[in-house]
Amino acid sequence: AEIVEIDTTENDFVLTPEMLEKAILEQGNQLKAVILNYPANPTGVTYSREQMAALADVLKKYDVFVVCDEVYSELTYTEQPHVSIAEFLPEQTIVINGLSKSHAMTGWRLGFTFAPAAFTAQLIKSHQYLVTAANTMAQFAGVEALTVGKDDAEPMKREYIERRDYIIEKMTELGFKIIKPDGAFYIFAKIPADYN
């Protein structure tokens, strides 16, 4: 496979339907898959329901498969909750997620996917050769996180918003250009040219 990058820098790191369609057509409609991660690492960019639906329309039109990293889905800071592209393209999407960010379980190596059955069968083949299994303690903790602790991300979100706003204020005072992240926990700042 050949990687095709779509530069979103000039659009505040937001992929638009026009950018996506242009990339597909430049590849002679041979583009097979798109990898999306949102909230994005490292920019914190998120997408509205309308933006996601518009991207899905293009992907459906050209029958492009989607691999979507949604590990920060519980850490969005806008009024609108996270919207998965799988809502619009359930038969064309593999969603990758986990508990490392939403439940502060980094290092536990506990993740999961949502995918159509045909893809899942293929994923299992790869998985069984790459990973033995999550340890028993992590599996029990994961069940607890997804049931009893399903709202555990809320206090973290409030804390991250406070930290984000503080860092943005201070870095802006120092002359950094920052696009306010609507998710994840990163600040992707442009370093001023005269900064030493």
Regions found by a protein language model. Give the residues of each.
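PLP-dependent class I/II
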Residues: 1-196
